[in-house]
């Protein structure tokens, strides 16, 4: 559904003409990133500036507005969605295609020499800022920070307020490690780098390190804050009114003292550290240009933070929580799919939105449930071909026995975060649909069963998931795997699996948890994706990669994959064995729980779904 952006763009261009750049007045272009001041993947409503100015509400994209043109860069997950949501004022720039120039290259080519390009320096990471700055400089143009966000000024009183919800403590029974022990590890790494301080702006890193959780961003258990870690101080920049009532006790239980400062004073404190200390200051390259520029270049260590890597490698308590939460989640998924199949077979009216609500209701009954981990992708027929589709009133479609149904969903539990996709057909799939599904499944089985050297980059494994599709000229326009937080963000770095190299990927290591999610999308017809969460565990092979160590994956998602969609002749004997073994594991894990709960209806459905092929 398109909405007019004409008035918004007119007002923004008026402000661009008056924007102050030193002694000059006026900018030729204004960049509107998706990010908030913490470079979060998802934003609270207050920070949805790119969505406000463009009408496109996908999670990834950058808007560029010049005096005459408005352009939106987004990746392959969102091409279809952007086409449907952008009005005639906008040009869609398909990021990732070889013919699409970068933002900096386009601006350098299309703006007059001497032009200024403005951006809010808090919303653009240093890593993104520098190449744009370099490309503009080559055309004698400048990228300049603009104080005061122009979109906020256009939005005015209609802009939703900044969220400021209460923070909760995460007890050791769920976090597994005290803050003091985490601090010891960070101190050692600071010492090795000859650094005095670590500046942390990523919200999930702060929440994990401090064993705290929040709800300032929907689906993401984080809270707006900054953190500075030194050898002898923990400085938390946060609205003190958000702190939990047991914050003093929380510090005692974690053997630390945390100094609380106003959220907005982070810049002042960084400048103070710069002026009073001589050693280096560690800050992630993904932090904002604003924060990074406060630190002289000669004093910066710009690397992924030690907290980011520590967080990705789960401890024993987190591992147990991940496994247990996925079992409870699997029960809810089976209850939903059993119910849904029965409703469709009866001819009952179930649409994408009511289906998503029903799934949420099943999850909400499970122990330690805290909410969803993202908006459920409940997609029937052609809606499934929109990779990150979310049902709305104007797009809501009935789930029926004539179309493929794709359901990508997840939940937050006190002891883990889930993310799972299943693709089903409640009638008779076409031969092409069955072939596409089987090739997606082959890729998932290949990826999930591979053995690889420790610390290999995720990109190296990506083609394993695509090969069966590539064999017949098919592919998918998204990554194969992302990290998953522990009662934290459903998308977590620094590792990942995709065609592109993740710049901060430290290599895959034991007890990281990532997704395994190949797919295929036939534009305007259907979508297929099969997604599990896998744990990286030691692999058993004859040799040991010259003592590097062997790793493999262990699937922890517990939900059957619809065998009706499979063309068995396309599977090897080994693949059939892998699938049957997985289904036996699902049965052995979930059937005792369903029996104990007296849920014979779901138990009967599960028994049917896990029959060997």
Swiss-Prot record:
Keyword Hydrolase: yes
Function: Catalyzes the removal of a penultimate prolyl residue from the N-termini of peptides, such as Arg-Pro-Pro.
Tissues where the protein occurs: Detected in gut, brain, testes and ovary.
Record-stated family: Belongs to the peptidase M24B family.
Record GO terms (molecular function): metal ion binding; metalloaminopeptidase activity
Primary localization: cytoplasm
Residues noted as binding Mn(2+) 2 in the record, renumbered to the chain: 419, 482, 517, 531
Activity-pH behavior: Optimum pH is 7.6.
Gene Ontology biological process terms from the UniProt entry: proteolysis
Cofactor(s) in the UniProt record: Mn(2+)
Catalytic activity of the protein: Release of any N-terminal amino acid, including proline, that is linked to proline, even from a dipeptide or tripeptide
Keywords noted in UniProt: Aminopeptidase, Cytoplasm, Hydrolase, Manganese, Metal-binding, Protease
One term under GO cellular component: cytosol
Entry protein name: Xaa-Pro aminopeptidase ApepP
Protease is among the record's keywords: yes
Residues at which Mn(2+) 1 binds: 408, 419, 531
Ways its activity is controlled: Inhibited by the chelating agent EDTA. Divalent metal ions have substrate- and concentration-dependent effects on activity. Activity towards bradykinin is inhibited with increasing Mn(2+) concentration. Activity towards substance P is stimulated by low Mn(2+) concentrations (in the range 10 uM-1 mM) but inhibited by Mn(2+) concentrations in excess of 1 mM. Ca(2+), Mg(2+) and Co(2+) stimulate activity towards substance P at concentrations of 10-100 uM but are inhibitory at concentrations of 1 mM. Zn(2+), Ni(2+) and Cu(2+) strongly inhibit activity towards substance P at concentrations of 1 mM.
InterPro entries xref list: Creatin/AminoP/Spt16_N, Creatinase/aminopeptidase-like, Creatinase_N, Pept_M24, Pept_M24B, Peptidase_M24_C, X-Pro_aminopeptidase_P
Compartments it resides in: Cytoplasm
Disulfide bonds: none
Binding site for substrate: 77, 388, 482, 491, 517
EC number: 3.4.11.9
